[in-house]
């Protein structure tokens, strides 16, 4: 949350609601998560016990799906959910190695999008924002431009103007995708992943979020350290200096990768 663009969304909603007539429906922002307890996390391999100690209200995407169902779908309303790419999967199941699985594969269909799509197939659609994909190369993974650069070549013919387009039953959606998403799938195409796509700029021109100076400070650093997420996924963050460095570097490192594509 230490980035200006997140705060700007709240400010925009506030300004809009102040401009509406008193009896007009207000623009709502729904928080799709609860407060996790990372201070309860036990280092070591993840298992049901140490994960449950962190996610005390249950599986996160189940929690999120229930909020959207109760607050939006059951009321016959619509919402735009901004979530991480994998959480938005609907029809697509993210593959993983399974020793006893057919072709040694199995598929996770329990992301937020998949949970909602199963119950409301005609009302749930997913749209991907232009981003880098990952591809396996030997024993490591590298970032690639979508469709190995074909998508950006086509966008360049349109002057790189921002545009949204269908992937479902469309020529672009029928293009083969060799990224990590194609693992365990035969003849995988981009349209199997998402229903639509929004192109903003070439990857080399995208910018990262803007860190808010002083968002984490001497007054709140102890609580921030106790609740800092996924401590087993990154270098230790032990003090305010480490925290500020992490917040600043996080978007920069992603954009450095994008700018090299």
Give the predicted meaning of each segment.
Residues 1-261:
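Compositional signal for N-terminal targeting/processing segments
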């Amino acid at each position: 949350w230490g980035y200006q663009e997140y705060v700007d969304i709240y400010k925009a909603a506030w300004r809009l609601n102040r401009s509406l007539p008193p009896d007009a429906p207000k623009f709502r922002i729904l928080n799709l998560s609860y407060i996790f307890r990372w201070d309860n996390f036990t280092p070591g391999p993840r298992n049901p016990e140490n994960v449950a100690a962190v996610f005390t209200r249950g599986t996160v995407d189940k929690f999120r799906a229930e909020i959207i169902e109760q607050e939006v779908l059951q009321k016959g309303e619509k919402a735009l959910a901004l979530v991480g790419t994998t959480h938005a999967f609907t029809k697509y199941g993210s593959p993983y190695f399974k020793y006893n699985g057919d072709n040694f594969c199995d598929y996770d269909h329990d992301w937020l999008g998949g949970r909602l799509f199963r119950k409301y197939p005609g009302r749930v659609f997913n749209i991907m924002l232009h981003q880098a994909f990952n591809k396996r190369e030997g024993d490591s993974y590298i970032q690639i431009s979508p469709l190995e650069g074909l998508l950006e070549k086509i966008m360049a013919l349109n002057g790189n103007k921002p545009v949204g387009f269908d992937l479902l039953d469309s020529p672009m959606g029928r293009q083969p995708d060799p990224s990590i998403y194609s693992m365990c799938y035969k003849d995988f195409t981009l349209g199997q992943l998402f229903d639509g796509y929004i192109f903003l700029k070439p990857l080399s021109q995208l910018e990262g979020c803007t860190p808010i100076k002083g968002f984490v400070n001497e007054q709140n650093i102890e609580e921030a350290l106790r609740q800092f997420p996924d401590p087993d996924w990154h270098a230790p963050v032990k003090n305010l200096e480490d925290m500020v460095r992490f917040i600043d570097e996080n978007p920069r490192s992603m954009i450095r990768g994008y700018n090299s594509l």
